[in-house]
A protein has these predicted regions:
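A detector of single, family-specific signature residues
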Residues: 1-387
Length: 389
């Protein structure tokens, strides 16, 4: 008897539904989100015919969490079904638009019963690959938070403190530079900045890590900070300075988190057997390699061919054909993280590989815009990576 299991998950409980190959309900139960609840789930599966040789597949609307991790540890196929797809499947069983947690569990079970071949199970990645995925994604999130904090701070400084922006306008990174943040922390208002001496500025630059040209840089900063600019009233300026310090603390925290998580991700990535192969590809370093491995994983059976990998990454186009109309367009539904690192990878490959540069130039010659040519190069690089890995 072929049985499928669906789980509608929540924070403190989960609804379980099991159906056989003919669609008959084998079992329904609500379990708690704890050890006892998971033990009950395993017992329900066993009673329905589950075995190590023929495990019952499970469908659930998430790929994360302790329940999913424990289910994957049992060695059974676990399918993460998009909630939007589940909502559309629900209409197959009732046109009244009724909904319940127990009913959703049965809908998930029926999805595996009827359309299992149309969905892919979660990959059987190694423990190290899963750890790299956690760290690489967390580091990317920290980078986004840093960018958000930086944009907020810069926008605020434009409102009341143009001197600090002008002082570092020609420096790479601008207000993100350690010395810029050090000066802002010491003088959060134009009035305080105008009072800084060259000795104080030299001390701030040294503390921020600058090693060369400290004296002339301190003199330059003092000249810029003491220039003539439009000003707010003193009380308003002080209030804006307090707000800037709060945003600066957020920026410093996000920057530290991004740096520390990057170091952790690289350290774990360097231990992976595929690290040497991945970094041998043109344009990939340890951090970008960790991001690629995090999204591709190390389950060799995950992608049937290079085309499926390219579609997953958003590098392969989508064709919409109906009657005499045929349109080829950029793929929107994709792994956004892998697609994002793809542009970084392709851009770096332009200087690391003459072949990559030649391919990019050919695409530009045929009329592709910069991003389209990069995406096409990313497509080629993904095919190359699958061959080597």
């Amino acid at each position: 008897m072929s049985v499928s299991c669906g789980i509608d998950w929540a924070e403190d409980h989960h609804d379980v539904g099991l159906v056989d190959a003919d669609g008959r309900i084998v079992g329904k139960h609500r379990i708690s989100d704890d050890v006892a609840g998971f033990a009950l789930l395993l017992q329900l599966l066993t009673d329905a015919g589950d075995s190590a040789e023929d495990p019952i597949p499970v469908a659930i609307e998430t790929s994360r969490g302790l329940l999913v991790a424990c289910l994957r540890a049992t060695g059974r196929p676990v399918y993460s079904i998009n909630p939007k797809a589940v909502d559309r499947y629900r209409d197959r069983h009732s046109v009244a638009r009724k909904k319940s947690d127990a009913g959703d569990a049965l809908v998930l079970a029926h999805i595996l019963r009827t359309d299992r071949a149309a969905h892919r199970p979660l990959p059987a990645d190694s423990e190290l690959a899963q750890a790299i995925a956690v760290l690489a994604r967390a580091q990317q999130d920290a980078v986004w938070e840093r960018t958000c904090a930086h944009n907020k701070l810069r926008s605020l400084l434009r409102e009341y403190y143009p001197a600090i922006l002008a002082a570092f306008a020609d420096k790479r990174g601008g207000i993100l530079r350690p010395e810029a943040r050090a000066v802002l922390a010491a003088a959060s208002t134009p009035a305080a900045a105008a009072k800084l001496t060259t000795a104080q500025l030299r001390k701030l630059l040294t503390a921020a890590g600058r090693q060369r040209g400290i004296a002339p840089e301190a003199q330059r900063l003092q000249t810029v900070l003491r220039g003539e600019y439009l000003r707010h009233p003193p009380l308003v300026e002080d209030a804006l300075g307090a707000q800037a310090l709060a945003l600066l603390r957020q920026l410093n925290t996000a920057s530290t988190n991004a740096d520390e998580l990057a170091a952790e991700a690289v350290a774990h990535f360097d231990k992976h057997p595929d690290a040497e192969i991945i970094t041998s590809l043109p344009g990939l370093g340890s951090l970008t390699g960790a991001r690629v491995l995090a999204e591709i994983g190390d389950d060799r059976s995950r992608f049937a061919d290079a085309r499926s990998l390219k579609a997953y990454a958003g590098a392969a186009p989508v064709t919409r054909a109906s009657g005499k109309s045929r349109t080829v367009m950029h793929r929107r539904v994709k792994n956004q993280r892998l697609a994002g690192v793809g542009y970084v990878w392709a851009f770096a490959a332009l200087t690391a590989s003459p072949g990559a540069r030649a391919h990019y130039d050919r695409r530009r010659t045929t009329g592709d815009r910069h991003t389209a040519a990069q995406r096409n190069l990313f497509n080629r690089l993904l095919g190359l990576s699958l061959i080597h890995i």
